[in-house]
């Protein structure tokens, strides 16, 4: 990549992030009145959750649509799809079949399909379900108002699944905070082409948002009371955000480590997270950020997928189990008590019992706190879909159960070890278990429930952990130093 990588520069060279807030941003403002209802059904990852929120923002600003939980009362219904799991397409068409009745009696409901299944299927969705009005990809959600208008004017279904680089971020309304924690997408796509994965084909190659654009969005959210920023990307630690290209100068590039350092300088931001990472891109610069930036949460999600080098090679992951463990050792040298979660695929084509035992050995060596683990799901069009898969389903399910039981037991022991400790918790709102209590998350992503005044929502508090439950912690606020 041309230009100077910012990771080679000191953090002091970064722009003053707090000064970015007053900069004008050419984005549509919210309408003065509600002109209709919008229903969105979201499947899949946090990127899809983020995209769905942006769809709502775009349609609120341009069409005056207000979100509803009831598709029956909606004027526009959208499904934001995920294609990671098997039979994803069939699930989408089942959903669409249920929505077909919404048009009964001639009601002018707009039905749209977005996300990764839309990218994969395109026109085929309309051919199979001609009552679908819109098909759009993750990179064209900002064009929803234009697509809706074109559908109404022409009477024809509209399909736009192109990959227009990073254009959508220039066309989105200003971000709206919905609580003390917010997601910020910093890049799109993936260029790793793992043999089992559809993401490069559905979301395109890696494209990073410009450095200053990300900082503007974070500053806007901080001004609205956001205290925790979650940086998003399919391969978020491959971030290379251009900056400094004015007057024909060669652009420089900020890596994720420097982006984190700069966000930490923005007033009000007390915690930073990021997901999802790829071990190949887990650099020394990022390890240094964990060492130097206290706002960077004491938690890392780093998908390893398998512990067998033979299977990792077949997956085209680009690293060995030893190299993965080496990165973890470097990280724990600067954050000894960091919690690490991961992704695992069990039963990848050709996985033997010996391969699986190597995965279990890696799990034991690293001590993962949490996992997202699944039996291998064949995705059409990926290289792995051509591999012979002769492991019985019962064997795969037994391996998965054993893997999950091991990690869950370790996670329970970590939770138990937290009893008696004081944890810094961002208060998110009332507890779902007991609305008279508050809830928030610890640094290592554990829900913590505790008595407290609702006025603390949006603040960090120190909570003494008194009990470890199966999926959460209980505690009480430390009165001597309760808020930061």
UniProtKB/Swiss-Prot annotation:
Q: Which residues bind [4Fe-4S] cluster 2?
A: 190, 194, 197
Location of the TRAM domain: 416-479
What PANTHER family does UniProt report for this protein, alphabetically?
Answer: CDK5 REGULATORY SUBUNIT-ASSOCIATED PROTEIN 1, MITOCHONDRIAL TRNA METHYLTHIOTRANSFERASE CDK5RAP1
The organism's superkingdom is given as Bacteria
Query: What residue stretches are annotated with the Radical SAM core domain?
Result: 176-415
Give residues annotated as binding [4Fe-4S] cluster 1.
45, 82, 116
Is Iron among the key words of this record? yes
One GO cellular-component annotation of the UniProt record comes to:
cytosol
Q: Which reaction does it catalyse?
A: N(6)-dimethylallyladenosine(37) in tRNA + (sulfur carrier)-SH + AH2 + 2 S-adenosyl-L-methionine = 2-methylsulfanyl-N(6)-dimethylallyladenosine(37) in tRNA + (sulfur carrier)-H + 5'-deoxyadenosine + L-methionine + A + S-adenosyl-L-homocysteine + 2 H(+)
Q: How is the cofactor bound?
A: Binds 2 [4Fe-4S] clusters. One cluster is coordinated with 3 cysteines and an exchangeable S-adenosyl-L-methionine.
Lineage of source species: Bacteria, Pseudomonadati, Pseudomonadota, Gammaproteobacteria, Lysobacterales
Q: Which residues form a coiled coil?
A: none
Q: What does this protein do?
A: Catalyzes the methylthiolation of N6-(dimethylallyl)adenosine (i(6)A), leading to the formation of 2-methylthio-N6-(dimethylallyl)adenosine (ms(2)i(6)A) at position 37 in tRNAs that read codons beginning with uridine.
Q: What is this protein called?
A: tRNA-2-methylthio-N(6)-dimethylallyladenosine synthase
Region described as Disordered: spans on this chain: 428-450
SUPFAM superfamilies according to UniProt? Radical SAM enzymes
Compartments reported by the entry: Cytoplasm
Q: Name one GO molecular function term.
A: 4 iron, 4 sulfur cluster binding
Q: Which family does it belong to?
A: Belongs to the methylthiotransferase family. MiaB subfamily.
Query: Quaternary structure per UniProt?
Result: Monomer.
Q: Does the keyword Transferase apply?
A: yes
Per UniProt, the enzyme's principal EC class comes to: transferase
Alphabetical list of CDD domains matching this protein: Radical_SAM
Keyword annotations from UniProtKB, A to Z:
4Fe-4S, Cytoplasm, Iron, Iron-sulfur, Metal-binding, S-adenosyl-L-methionine, Transferase, tRNA processing
